[in-house]
């Protein structure tokens, strides 16, 4: 099985061939290893987050690119402004990096990252419950419709269904991401089937997600409070990280290095 820490180092090295290390917040694992459903042949995929300068804010569009490694693994490179947008959209493929056990965080940014985003992650992931429901249902329906007989896609559909059931019941996000072993065994067994005998499971999932997508959860006072704390923490974190990069650049400007 692929060594995750080694993979992170390789992904980091690939990013640093294109971007300077002082702009790199970190490299974070996302995907099946976080969910406990990885297999012997599972790739390691990551997200690398960049910090823009004040000049970047004015002159450049946020970076959003993909690096494909020689072994066909992927590293998605995002400006932190785009990351915050994904957090506010409640995109679980990005939110999960707040909980992964596998990441490299630049020591220069580590304290601010942990003091803002990690410290408030349990509120960020409940920033907008309705957006989470819509995001997951949309992702699940799209995945299932791609191939209703593909075991890997149906396994992913069930994983998202279990996640949503736990999330809407207020479970801690980490528990929503990684299911109990009995469910993991079921998900892995499904995932390993290249073709299912019929579309029964797909039909059941599509019906369930279509029904859930129609729900509208009222934001009560507690939910509004969580939303506001998450909003402020993300904005403060974003500003502090950008200012930190610019302070670093000001101190080292005599190096003559170009951005």
Identify the residue ranges that each predicted region occupies.
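Acidic, carboxylate-rich catalytic segments that either coordinate divalent cations
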Residues: 230-259
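Soluble or luminal CAZymes and related metallo-dependent hydrolases
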Residues: 3-8, 75, 79, 149, ...
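Generic structural signal for hydrophobic core residues of well-folded globular domains
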Residues: 50, 87, 161-168, 245
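A basic- and aromatic-enriched beta-loop-alpha substructure that forms the phosphate/nucleotide-
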Residues: 57-139
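Conserved nucleotidyltransferase catalytic core and NTase-mimicking acidic/glycine-rich helix/loop elements
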Residues: 107-240
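Helical scaffold of the NTase/Pol beta-like nucleotidyltransferase catalytic core
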Residues: 1-28
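Catalytic metal-binding acidic patch
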Residues: 31-72, 157
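A generic fold-level signal
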Residues: 22, 39-41, 152
């Amino acid at each position: 099985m692929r060594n995750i820490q080694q993979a992170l180092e390789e992904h980091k090295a690939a990013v640093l061939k294109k971007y300077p290390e002082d702009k790199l917040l970190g490299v974070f694992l996302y995907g099946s290893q976080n969910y406990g459903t990885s297999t012997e042949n599972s790739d390691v995929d990551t997200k690398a987050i960049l910090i823009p300068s004040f000049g970047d804010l004015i002159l450049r569009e946020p970076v959003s690119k993909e690096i494909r490694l020689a072994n066909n693994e992927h590293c998605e490179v995002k400006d932190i402004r785009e990351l915050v947008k994904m957090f506010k959209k409640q995109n679980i493929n990005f939110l999960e990096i707040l909980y992964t056990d596998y990441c490299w965080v630049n020591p220069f940014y580590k304290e601010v990252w942990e003091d803002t985003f990690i410290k408030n992650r349990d509120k960020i992931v409940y920033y907008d419950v309705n957006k989470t429901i819509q995001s997951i249902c949309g992702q699940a329906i799209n995945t299932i419709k791609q191939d209703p007989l593909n075991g890997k896609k149906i396994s992913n559909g069930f994983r998202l269904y279990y996640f949503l059931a736990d999330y809407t019941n207020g479970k801690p996000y980490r528990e929503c991401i990684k299911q109990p072993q009995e469910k993991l065994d079921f998900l892995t067994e499904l995932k390993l089937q290249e073709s299912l005998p019929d579309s029964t499971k797909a039909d059941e999932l599509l019906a369930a997600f279509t029904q859930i997508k129609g729900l509208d959860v009222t934001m009560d006072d507690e939910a509004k409070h969580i939303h506001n704390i998450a909003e402020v923490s993300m904005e403060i974190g974003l500003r502090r990280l950008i200012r930190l990069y610019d302070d670093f650049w000001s101190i080292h400007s005599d190096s003559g290095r170009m951005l």
